[in-house]
Amino acid sequence: MKIVRNVWLAIVAIVMMGCVDKKPFFEMRGAVLAVEDLETADWPRIAYENGINTLGTHITPNQVLRFWESEKGKQFQEECRRYGIKVEHELHAMKDLLPRELFDMDSTMFRMDESGRRVADFNCCVSSARALDTIAAQALFYAQHLTSTNHRYYFWLDDGAPICQCPECSTLSASEQALIIENRMLTAIRTYDKEAMVAHLAYYSSLKAPEKVKPEEGIFLEFAPFQRRLDKPINDSISEVSDIGNNAVNLTYLKENLKVFPVETAVVLDYWLDVSMASRWKKPAVELPWNGDVFRSDVDTYAAMGIRNVTTFAVYMDSTYFATYPRTDYLKEYGAAINR
């Protein structure tokens, strides 16, 4: 009997060890916040208490750098270290990477519009070696000053904005022009961080997978289905969505991109907690219209496609938001689903 009992205890111990060692399916379980959110709400603690293991800062490199070097920014970094939260920076970057005032020095670094004029409104000319060198040098500067504790770097082009139409660039899609820049930034940043990975943002005009340009090893897919309904699952093919047709069209784009970029490192950046979107990017913020069933369906869909990294905008969730809308059960639901 004693032998049987010892065997039984050993089996129980093995089972318990398996339970303890079992890791969640999703490796990155994130949220992306604007500087004002991070300055006024205790997001390292909120993340820790709700099973979020990665926080992304937002919006522009210069803005985030000012926060990062401030006392509040240093406190944020220390709290993230204390709670074991990884930090990355998801940045609308082009105007900081290629400052618009350089236009007078060399207009060929900037995009050509449909009428053949060089303009400094958005993005750049990816056929300009000088533009790519400038962008790469600036990306390296920000990578050195904005520590990414998971070695992922996000420097986005201008949101859904016009791209270069010069003779050399006009044959390239938005995603291909973006990938040229991303490949160049990766080379520069790896002189500082040998483990660096750079995001290729598939979003809005760059949803189409690149064909003519190939990603260097270390470029990872970041897929952001901006054109979607959040009251319907991402695999819904019935309810109409303007410009794209329906939610499920996003998954077609995702599948095509996963033929180009590794699924193992791919990230989905969705909008489940995005108060700024619900508020139409204008304060005062409205209360988050949380759809828990939709969210859980979405993460199941992404998991079935092999996606192991998910995050969401949670912009406008600052101290004023939490004081105005104290109910936060959706954070527990979010954390529970991505920690399965």
Where are these predicted regions, by residue range?
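Bacterial Sec-dependent signal peptides at the C-terminal "C-region" and cleavage site
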Residues: V15-F25
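N-terminal secretory signal peptides that target proteins for export/translocation
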Residues: M1-I3
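Aromatic-lined carbohydrate-binding surfaces of glycoside hydrolases
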Residues: G30-D243, L258-F261, T265-Y302, I307-R340
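Second-shell residues forming the walls of enzyme active-site clefts
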Residues: G245-K255
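Sec-dependent N-terminal signal peptides
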Residues: N6-M16
